[in-house]
């Protein structure tokens, strides 16, 4: 079990969540490829039911819990509990993480996650960055979808106001640290005065690595925050690597229920409501988003 080995070995809970993911994938594949060479028959309903059976019979009774801000003594902001899943060295006491990898510099097992991210690297091959469409997928705190065509979002800082806490945890924004001594600050550039005066007046601006070179350059303006240890100064890192979480099982269950036409308040209470509560987002019944790029798919 997860509790026996603190999530450091493959365990029953992780196997359950993996089974749910596989069944959801296969069911979705057969349903949406029905009648093509990729799916000669459609047993999707059977697979979706299997996902829910795994949830009802095994996952929910397993005693796993989401890592919440309210129960985290170190949390001060709404996004802190979610962030802690990805920027901590030790996840032994966080039951939401059912399977993870531990690093120890003393034992010669380490990574360079914060070292890379703090320098602007998210891809070791070429310059990169998180997409605007990903950022737009995060809800407002009142549970409504964002209107990406709103002119106010031309201001970088407006993008993060009154938004899902997971967006704040995932994307670098004003006030975030790249590492212990590197604070990000974005504001409108003051173009008045001479070149020297402009340089002096704007020296407090620290962009999300837009001015980097090669793989150290961010090309979208949205830089990954998850995985950054803000106590990092230099050298190698011990940031833990999450491989499976309880939240994944909740999402699988909710999606399978929606595919079966069985998504209701009871399902929401067990799945999406607690996830959104942690993110500081008011739960509202899923509805069609007029700006959703994949029109035709169910909203839940």
Task: Please place each PLM-identified region on the residue numbering.
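C-terminal substrate/ligand-recognition segments
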Residues: 160-277
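An aromatic- and glycine-enriched ligand-binding surface/loop that stacks and positions planar moieties
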Residues: 9-13, 21-204
């Amino acid at each position: 079990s997860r509790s026996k080995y603190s999530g450091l070995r493959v365990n029953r809970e992780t196997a359950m969540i993996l089974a749910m993911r596989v069944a959801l994938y296969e069911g979705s594949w057969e349903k949406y490829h029905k009648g093509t060479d990729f799916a000669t028959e459609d047993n999707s309903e059977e697979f979706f039911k299997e996902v829910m059976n795994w949830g009802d019979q095994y996952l929910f009774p397993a005693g796993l819990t989401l890592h919440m801000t309210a129960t985290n003594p170190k949390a001060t902001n709404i996004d802190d509990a979610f962030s802690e899943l990805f920027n901590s060295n030790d996840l032994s006491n966080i039951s939401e993480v059912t399977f993870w990898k531990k690093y120890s510099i003393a034992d010669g097992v380490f990574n360079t996650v914060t070292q890379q991210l703090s320098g602007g690297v998210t891809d070791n091959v070429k310059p990169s960055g998180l997409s605007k469409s990903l950022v737009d997928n995060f809800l407002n705190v009142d549970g409504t979808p964002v209107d990406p065509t709103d002119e106010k979002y031309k201001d970088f800082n407006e993008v993060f106001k009154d938004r899902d806490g997971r967006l704040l945890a995932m994307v670098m924004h004003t006030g975030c640290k790249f590492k212990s001594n590197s604070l990000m600050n974005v504001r409108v550039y003051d173009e008045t005065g001479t070149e020297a005066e402009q340089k002096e007046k704007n020296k407090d601006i620290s962009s999300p690595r837009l001015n980097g070179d090669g793989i150290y350059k961010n090309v979208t303006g949205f830089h990954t925050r998850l995985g950054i240890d803000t106590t990092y100064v230099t050298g190698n890192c011990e940031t833990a690597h999450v491989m499976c979480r309880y939240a994944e099982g909740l999402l699988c269950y909710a999606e399978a229920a929606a595919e079966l036409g069985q998504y209701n308040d009871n399902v929401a209470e067990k799945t999406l409501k607690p996830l959104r509560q942690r993110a500081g987002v008011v739960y509202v019944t899923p509805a069609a988003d007029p700006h959703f790029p994949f029109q035709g798919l169910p909203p839940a």
